[in-house]
Amino acid sequence: MNTNKQFKVYTTSAVDFAQDPTALSSNINAPQFDKAIVVHVFFSQNKNLEDLQEFQLLVKSANVDILSIITTSRSTPQAKYFVGQGKAEEIAQAVEQLNADIVLVNHSLTPAQARNLESICQCRVVDRTGLILDIFAQRARSHEGKLQVELAQLRHLATRLVRRKTGLDQQKGAVGLRGPGETQLETDRRLIKVRITQLQNRLEKVAKQRNQNRQTRRKADIPTISLVGYTNAGKSTLFNVLTQANVYVADQLFATLDPTLKRLPIQDVGNCVLADTVGFIRELPHDLVSAFKSTLQETTEASLLLHVIDVADSRKLENMLTVNEVLSEIKANQVTTLLVYNKIDQVENIQPHIEFDEENQPIAVYLSAQLNQGLDLLVEAIRQKLSHEILHLEINLAAQYGKIRHCFYQLNCVRQEKINEQGEFLLDIQIDKIEWLKLSKQFPLLKRFYETTEISDK
């Protein structure tokens, strides 16, 4: 093996970074890698090829050509290379023989493992997390999306900086103050920290604006419906046919990154806001979930979630579990959810229909967004769900509970108010069930009003 192969390291100096604060993060994606060696490790006797196939789709989504796929089986990751020494040498040989630009590993590597593989392969090594971050960087179109991706990239990069010899290491002090000056590593860490703080401040402003928009919709009594689901389940296609929008649709992972909001009128409910959001995936980088907090807030504070599922996917149950895990992480698992089984045209013996629970409430809709089949059933299920989730209550509060009254007015849910002879507030309110449950936890005395209403309605 030729050990003299030139190894190009892509770095950004402190000087470049000072001149352009985005240089360090944007330079992560500067080289255009076209040819890759894909590495996958099976950690069980049953070789599940679907994980590898999904990773190949991720690589395709990143616009990278796969030259070769190298697989191996292990019981546990090896500490130094993640794969064994022999397999690492095999990967290095493949890189040289096929003239690959990059090695893509379908697992999360420690910084040390990535550096060791880079050293033996003499090319850049990117793990699953890095690849997903790169795809997000390519797809981000809005200003907010670009800020969020940059923040996630910098957080990921901060753990992977290594010491390297530069001129800054040679700085010396005067008499009595001798010693090395600030190293390049220290400089990069400091500048990354500064840039992360800048991005967080900017995103806080964006988050405030989003929150104001949500408050405005809430005061106008406009429900928000958020599309969630595993990536490539057909959320954007469904969004387009429901709202006559023109959101980018493609048969690839993470085709949609920036959230889109459109008006959706629902009979007996009125105008709603439908939100198309980024898809989820197994092992979604935590840095991304954290960076996209303001975007995902649309999901957290929605009136209804439409969990879109690719019914033709053999791993749909695992995908649903992954989505539910992310929803729990962002604290959206308590939001009322309607399951939407999409792509029924790709399976046999399934017709468009609504599935109901024991209380005759819709829990799932089967449809094909691509063929416009079952969309009327979905709209009807949404109507029933939202009608059921909006509470109409009559509340009487003693004068000392003015704080509760103030909360109702803040939510703009008071339709009418009177004061009786005892000085009690008689409130006629219309409130989202989720908001009511939140208030009931804060003020337990409210629970009796909802229970009384449920009994009287039966």
Curated annotation (Swiss-Prot):
Residues 223-390 form the Hflx-type G domain. PROSITE patterns: G_HFLX. It comes from the Bacteria. GO terms for molecular function: GTP binding; GTPase activity; guanosine tetraphosphate binding; metal ion binding; ribosome binding. It is found in: Cytoplasm. Its main location: cytoplasm. Mg(2+) binds at residues 236, 256. InterPro entries: EFG_III/V, G_HFLX_dom, GTP-bd, GTP-bd_M, GTPase_HflX, GTPase_HflX_N, GTPase_HflX_N_sf, P-loop_NTPase. GTP binds at residues 229-236, 254-258, 276-279, 342-345, 368-370. GO terms for cellular component: cytoplasm. Its cofactor is Mg(2+). Keywords: Cytoplasm, GTP-binding, Magnesium, Metal-binding, Nucleotide-binding. The keyword Ribonucleoprotein does not apply. PANTHER family: GTP-BINDING PROTEIN 6-RELATED (PTHR10229:SF0), GTP-BINDING PROTEIN HFLX (PTHR10229). NCBIfam families: GTP_HflX (TIGR03156), PRK11058.1 (NF008280). Monomer. Associates with the 50S ribosomal subunit. GTPase that associates with the 50S ribosomal subunit and may have a role during protein synthesis or ribosome biogenesis. Belongs to the TRAFAC class OBG-HflX-like GTPase superfamily. HflX GTPase family. This is GTPase HflX. It comes from Histophilus somni (strain 129Pt). The gene is hflX.
